[in-house]
Amino acid sequence: MEQFFELLNNGQRDDALKLMDEKVEMRVHVGDNARTLRGVEQVGGWFLRADKGMRMIPANERDMGQNLEIDLMVMRPGVQSQHLDATFRVEAGKITAINFAPR
């Protein structure tokens, strides 16, 4: 995961996406709703469309076996930073699932 965030934060988003499984799923919670994206095209597109200056700063990583729980700070130009509870599932070296929920 360290490599994923390093690539993402250095603007190498295409390379960061190569760390995802083709069938990756991502759930983004906003308020009482959740949106699920499936496949590297949809999930990767979410990261590629994000603001160019977006940074995701991980902290307090907790290894739960296949899942990694992370306190994540998201910074975007001109917008107040946001703290998220993030869970990443990694199988065979590939990210297979991502879950973002506001704190």
Can you say where each PLM-predicted feature lies in the sequence?
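Short, aromatic-enriched amphipathic alpha-helices that serve as compact interaction elements
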Residues: 1-12
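Short, well-ordered alpha-helical segments enriched in acidic and aromatic residues
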Residues: 11-27
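Short beta-strand segments enriched in hydrophobic/aromatic residues
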Residues: 20, 74-76, 102
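A short gly/proline-enriched turn/hairpin at secondary-structure junctions
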Residues: 25-35
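Hydrophobic/anchoring residues in structured secondary elements
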Residues: 26, 61-63, 100
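Surface-exposed, charged secondary-structure patches
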Residues: 38-81, 85
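Short beta-strand edge/turn micro-motifs at domain boundaries
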Residues: 81-103
